[in-house]
Each structure stands twice: as structure tokens, then as C-alpha cells.
From Swiss-Prot:
One Pfam family in the UniProt entry: NUDIX
Keywords: DNA damage, DNA repair, DNA replication, Hydrolase, Magnesium, Metal-binding, Mutator protein
Chain ranges for the short sequence motif Nudix box as given in the UniProt record: 26-47
Function: Specifically hydrolyzes both 8-oxo-deoxyguanosine triphosphate (8-oxo-dGTP) and 8-oxo-guanosine triphosphate (8-oxo-GTP) to the related monophosphates, thereby cleaning up the nucleotide pools and preventing misincorporation of 8-oxoGua into DNA and RNA. It prevents replicational errors by removing an oxidatively damaged form of guanine (8-oxo-dGTP) from DNA and the nucleotide pool. 8-oxo-dGTP can be inserted opposite dA and dC residues of template DNA with almost equal efficiency thus leading to A.T to G.C transversions.
GO BP annotation list: DNA repair; DNA replication
Family the entry assigns: Belongs to the Nudix hydrolase family.
PROSITE patterns associated with the record: NUDIX, NUDIX_BOX
Name assigned to this protein: 8-oxo-dGTP diphosphatase
Lineage start: Bacteria, Pseudomonadati, Pseudomonadota, Gammaproteobacteria, Enterobacterales
Gene name per UniProt: mutT
Reaction it catalyzes: 8-oxo-dGTP + H2O = 8-oxo-dGMP + diphosphate + H(+); 8-oxo-GTP + H2O = 8-oxo-GMP + diphosphate + H(+)
Entry annotated with the keyword Translocase: no
Amino acid sequence: MELLSKKKVYITRGKYKKNIWEFPGGKVKKHENIVHALKRELLEEVGIIVLKINFFQYIEYIYPEKKIKLYFFLKKKWKGRPYSIEGYTYLWKRLCHLRALDFPLANHSVINALKKNNILIKFR
């Protein structure tokens, strides 16, 4: 789940691996659909109310210990000022600078897709 603003992407330090950067997001609860989970997680973690989103990419990634499913959405419009409610370090980074940071392996393909599609210009 990417927050995009003025050609920059909102990222935060990982909850479980402090040296890894992540896009905001979380797990879908049993009673939720993906969009409800997205809105809940962003309100809980980043303090914003999502007003407009666009589906971007679905990824299944297999780590040695587990298989994960990731749904990436682009948040085009929101209410509130994004910050880390849970107190994790966060940054607004230009897409061209993301490769210099450590991200989970599962996120590499979405970073490449954002760059390839010039998303930050299309969706700002």
C-alpha cells in the first residue's frame, strides 16, 4: 500500500525487523474485505482516512518459512496528515531513492513496477 504525495512515497521502518523499510499496511481480518482492511490499517498506523484508492498490483511471494499475498493500492486522496501513530520511524522518499534502502524481498517487484510505470507522475 503506497501513499503518494508530490512525487514521494511514504515508508516506515518495519515492525518486526527494525532495519527494514516497508510500505504501510497489514493483515486482512476474517470479517473484512481487502479495501476495508486497507482503510482500517491506514487509520490505525498512519492516522489518515482514505478517500480515493487505485488497485496497483497483486503479488504472491514465497519465503522459506511462509507464503504471503500482497495487494498494493495507490492512495491518491486522503484526509489527515500521515504520521506514525505507533511511533515507528517514517520518511517521505523519492521513488528513485528507494533502491538504496532495505525492503522485504517481496516489495522489490512493486518498487520496480512503480518506476517502470512512472506512477508518481500519473497519480500525484
